[in-house]
C-alpha cells in the first residue's frame, strides 16, 4: 500500500514519491511461496526468568517470511555451534510441514558469520558451512539495521512482553518444554497480515504435500 501497510504476505509495499525517505530494496521484496526466505535470530533470555543465577539461556527463532510460521529452540550458549544445530533442527521441522527452506537471513553476529572478525574474516563459521552442506543460501542483512530482519525482531518483542514477563526456567530442558507450548500457541493464533488466518492455517492453504 502507498502508506506502507503490509500486504497479505507481510511485506511492506513500495512508497510513493512523496515519501520523505527511501526504503531499502530488500524491504519491498514479496515472497511467493513458503520457505523462500526464513529469518533467524537469537534472543537472550532475561536473567530474571532463570532460576540459577549462574545459568545463561538463549532462544533461537526462525520465522518463514511467507507464512509467518515460527520454529523455536533454546540453548545454553549463543555460538556458531548452537546456530549450526538450530539450522539442522529447523530444516527438519519445516520439512515435516511441507516446507523446503531455500534461504536463511540473519544479522552479522559472530554466531552466524565471521564477516566482521578481524582475524577470521575469510574463515567460514560452522553455521555457514552447515548451510552450504544443506544447499541453503545465506543472506546477511546490512550491519546495524535490525529492521531488515523485522519479522523475527517483532516476534521477539512480543515474546518478551507476553512470555518472558510471566515465566521462569530451571534448566535448558525446561525452557524448551515451555517454548514448545509457546510455539503451538503463536503458530495457531490468527494474524491480521494473514487476513486473520493463523500461520498454520495459512501454511495449510499454501503447501501441497506429497
Give, region by region, the residue ranges found by the protein language model:
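Mobile-element integrase/transposase regions
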Residues: 2-63, 69, 85, 96
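C-terminal domain-tail junction helix/linker
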Residues: 10, 16-17, 21-30, 36, ...
